[in-house]
Curated annotation (Swiss-Prot):
<dbReference type="InterPro" id="IPR023415">
    <property type="entry name" value="LDLR_class-A_CS"/>
</dbReference>
<dbReference type="InterPro" id="IPR001862">
    <property type="entry name" value="MAC_perforin"/>
</dbReference>
<feature type="binding site">
    <location>
        <position position="113"/>
    </location>
    <ligand>
        <name>Ca(2+)</name>
    </ligand>
</feature>
<keyword id="KW-0106">Calcium</keyword>
<feature type="disulfide bond">
    <location>
        <begin position="498"/>
        <end position="545"/>
    </location>
</feature>
<comment type="subunit">
    <text>Heterotrimer of 3 chains: alpha (C8A), beta (C8B) and gamma (C8G); the alpha and gamma chains are disulfide bonded. Component of the membrane attack complex (MAC), composed of complement C5b, C6, C7, C8A, C8B, C8G and multiple copies of the pore-forming subunit C9.</text>
</comment>
<feature type="glycosylation site" description="N-linked (GlcNAc...) asparagine">
    <location>
        <position position="438"/>
    </location>
</feature>
<feature type="disulfide bond">
    <location>
        <begin position="375"/>
        <end position="400"/>
    </location>
</feature>
<feature type="transmembrane region" description="Beta stranded">
    <location>
        <begin position="248"/>
        <end position="256"/>
    </location>
</feature>
<keyword id="KW-0325">Glycoprotein</keyword>
<feature type="disulfide bond">
    <location>
        <begin position="500"/>
        <end position="516"/>
    </location>
</feature>
<dbReference type="InterPro" id="IPR036055">
    <property type="entry name" value="LDL_receptor-like_sf"/>
</dbReference>
<feature type="domain" description="LDL-receptor class A">
    <location>
        <begin position="94"/>
        <end position="132"/>
    </location>
</feature>
<feature type="disulfide bond">
    <location>
        <begin position="140"/>
        <end position="177"/>
    </location>
</feature>
<keyword id="KW-0204">Cytolysis</keyword>
<feature type="disulfide bond">
    <location>
        <begin position="115"/>
        <end position="130"/>
    </location>
</feature>
<dbReference type="GO" id="GO:0031640">
    <property type="term" value="P:killing of cells of another organism"/>
</dbReference>
Amino acid sequence: MLVAAFFTLFLVTCQPAVTAQEKVNQRVNRAATPRAFDCQLSSWSEWTDCFPCQDTKYRHRSLLQPNKFGGTICSGDIWDRASCYSPTACLRPAQCGQDFQCKETGRCLKRHLVCNGENDCLDGSDEDNCEDIRATESDCAQYDPIPGSEKAALGYNILTQEEAQSVYDARYYGGRCETVYNGEWRHVRYDPVCERLHHGEDDKYFRKPYNFLKYHFEARADTGISFELYVDGNDLFSKVKNDKSHSAGVTISAGLTGSPLLGTVGVSGSEDASFLNKLSQYNEKKYNFMRIFTKVQTAHFKMRRDDIVLDEGMLQALVELPEQYNYGMYSKFINDYGTHYITSGSMGGTYEYILVLNTEKMESLGVTSEDISSCFGGFGEIQYEKGKINAQGILSGKHCKKSGSGDKEADKMGQAVKDIISRVRGGSSGWGGGLSQNGSATTYRFWGRSLKYNPVVIDFEMQPIHEVLLHTNLGHVEAKRQNLRRALDQYLMEFNACRCGPCFNNGKPILEGTSCRCQCSLGLQGPACEQTEQQGAKADGHWSCWGSWSPCTAGTRERRRECNNPAPQNGGAPCPGWRVQTQAC
């Protein structure tokens, strides 16, 4: 009897301890896991003819099915190129009439731009063999181009929400010497190389490229410093994505794409995918996220609407597109130069970083989020009030430092911060990079000053890429414009995260390359976030992909999508935007 009792006690006391994760697994509702889908690519298309000016030929294949829910991934790219030999000489068709034609790209120039001392052709052929060079009026070479002009000239991909190659030629002036007055040129500037203060005499005027209709410097103005606390990294990611969508003058969730994140095949990762991967490292209940954000505007611009001069790289790629529709070549063009181009916007920079807070450490140290908000953010003496951080007067930066030199309170708060994710855009690389390492008021102040001369585009309006062809002086491009429009519809569908669903319980569908995954919130498991601890929790709906266009009737056609990818559950929000889209035809 004693032996039996001892053996029973041994069984009870000597079983392996149940971990916290195993306890969670025991509570999780075991919903049915969706069937895995393997990635499928189409067969390669036939090679194109050899392009004589490139000695290159192309082929492509389509993404028939991205892998999802643990399916087998695809290897390789969807575009391919190979060297070739063409017996045809590289000759640009004469299409400029009495005007000058650039040798490499075929750009047409008025005769007064030839031998004017400026390279209006990328290859400089307009300045070859010049006996008499006519200098541009007022010797405009002394002026630097307006800050940020190269950034505004870039295309934009609304799927990845990233910049593409140049659409406008930001180096073309058309023989004009139009300058923009910088009202802050008298202000004292700091030269970090020489470590001295000086007046910016050289920055009194900047030269405006031809494709810019307007450019106006503005006194630095920020949007105020916002302070946001998130329990779930997915909610933080959605907020960041929505802010980017609104900055781009389009609400992605209500438009053609209807997806939180889409990655383009052929692009080696995206900024947002990298950010999400960092957040995923802290997908545990003990971590919260503090977002500190401000946007600084330094200039406003508007691009020329008509007679746009395209970047010569884009012009050359456009010339080489076939007249007959070839989705592979047109989709590669879109992937290179963007789905859209910028028509107007604002220059400046954004200062944003995410503090990963260890709530268990905070509780043991007696530290609150309000305490931490007064220490971090790169602004020094900042006061927290009603969910906002407000800079008061001159920011001294003496209130708190993470690496507190003898400051016990600062050290305590620093211990509560597990990680800092920096997302600074704009400004000189030295000061911008320094913000993530040194959050002093001096560093922030000089970063803000450097934005005037090293800005990025922070808010902008845009148009579909095929529309730019309507506003150039190029002839005989209507067939290619229609092909580009058709390819854009197909491209937006092929690389759309709607193909990745359904992700249940507010999981986020993500398409990276040819692979889908669902980013799950806290307490969710499974490849489709289908396993949850909470019964009856609200889950928002997500759109299916758009269906095919209907036949053209009375000058219009339509297509539909359904809010079933998945449908809303337990009172969750319906899908935003329209179920039916109409288009002139």
